[in-house]
Amino acid sequence: MTNSPSSPVVLTNEEIMGLLPHRYPFALVDRVVEYEPGKSATGIKNVTINEPHFQGHFPGRPLMPGVLIVEAMAQVGGLIVKQIPDLPKGLFVFAGIDSVRFRRPVVPGDQLLINCELISIKRQRFGKVKGEAKVDGNLVCSGELMFSLVD
């Protein structure tokens, strides 16, 4: 983790890979620009035409699938849940979504700025995070994401 006394903690792609199990083509967070372990995180996803889903979604009018926007939000949220002190070590998996709304399309060339904040932890096994994804300051997706510890 890179930081100085006056700057927020940031994570490089390599550091993210040390915390999350996702790998290409499903690693959807390029870097983290703000990170308070166990509390909040802001990540960036650079959307490029080279991503495999754009071949069929949709030819001639490529749009990032909404489920992948939600997954990118979940990966940023996973960074928060993964670093909560005193939680058992193990694999936290995406377990559910509530109140997800899509506001505008995301296209190649966009940069998603994803902000997530911890809402709650229950029984040291279940986490809930509030997430928002924006492009150029405009909200494109928001919702609540749930995580569960897998034995």
UniProtKB/Swiss-Prot annotation:
GO MF annotation: an example: (3R)-hydroxyacyl-[acyl-carrier-protein] dehydratase activity
UniProt keyword rRNA-binding present: no
Enzyme class: lyase
Gene3D superfamilies, sorted: Hotdog Thioesterase
Entries under Pfam families matching the protein: FabA (PF07977)
Gene Ontology BP term (one): fatty acid biosynthetic process
Active site: 57
Domain of life: Bacteria
Alphabetical keyword list: Cytoplasm, Lipid A biosynthesis, Lipid biosynthesis, Lipid metabolism, Lyase
Keyword Lipid metabolism: yes
EC numbers: 4.2.1.59
InterPro entries: FabA_FabZ, FabZ, HotDog_dom_sf
Reported function: Involved in unsaturated fatty acids biosynthesis. Catalyzes the dehydration of short chain beta-hydroxyacyl-ACPs and long chain saturated and unsaturated beta-hydroxyacyl-ACPs.
Entry similarity comment: Belongs to the thioester dehydratase family. FabZ subfamily.
HAMAP family: FabZ
PANTHER family documented for this protein: 3-HYDROXYACYL-[ACYL-CARRIER-PROTEIN] DEHYDRATASE
Protein name in UniProt: 3-hydroxyacyl-[acyl-carrier-protein] dehydratase FabZ
